[in-house]
Amino acid sequence: MKRKTCLNNGWQFLEKEYSEENLQCPDGEYMPVRLPHDYLIYDVRNLYRDSVGWYRRKLMYVPDGLERVLFFEGIYMDSEVFVNGRSAGTWKYGYSSFEVDITQYIEAGENELLVRVVHRSPNSRWYSGAGIYRSVYLIERESTHIASSGLYITPVKRAASDTWDVEVEVEAAHGADDEKPFDSIRYIITQKNGKHDMRTNEEDSLCIIFNQLIGEKSNIYRHTFEITAPKLWDIYCGNLYELRAELIKAGEVF
């Protein structure tokens, strides 16, 4: 089971430098904001100023045995995430997404999320903005799951053949008490888009399913399967295929 909920609403914002006295939650008049948000743009005459922004939000939690993870698509620049006054994680780069596992920090009922964003200049050759400039999501998942960005694909064409060997590596996370958390991994290959071929005026569709049993518990699972004569991408038809991996236990998607 996995649920992904957008948390772009319900935030409050305050721009204020921090010190040892107000390291986590400074006093001040917070203003309501909706993400994505750039606070540097408020002062167009001073777009490269050193500054610190604070974002806070309430989050309700009902214990159900699932992990809770905050997924940030982008914060500029250096950030730290607090849950109920405790630091849950930091991220020191403004141009990539990241996640923070807050499972051990949340409590039943109402919780407070606080994100501190530190912007220091000079840092770019262009206007970067500052703040939580992309969406934020709450992910609810089982303790056993495919890790974020944990699916790696390497297609290798056989010499003098139209057959391709698709090498897949899956990185899985397991709960501490899971001896054999799932029975198999199901791989599903489908055509994602680019169905119309300008040269032949034909539609193409593909759905291939592979089921691979697993042996001993591991963090990395590797499988290889073959595909014959896939339609390749070219300038006339942007063929694109999608591979989805699912963890299967007792015939059901985990």
Where are the language model's segments positioned?
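Accessory beta-strand-rich segments of carbohydrate-active enzymes
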Residues: R3-Y18, V33, R45-S149, G175
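Beta-sandwich strand segments
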Residues: S19-L23, N123-G129, M198-R199, G251-F254
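Glycan-recognition and processing domains
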Residues: L23-H37, W126
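Extended substrate-binding grooves/exosites of carbohydrate-active enzymes
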Residues: M31-D43, R86, A250-F254
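Structural beta-strand segments of beta-rich domains
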Residues: R68, D162-V168
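Short, solvent-exposed loop/turn motifs
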Residues: S87, H145, Y152, K195-H196, ...
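Short beta-strand segments of immunoglobulin-like
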Residues: G150-A159
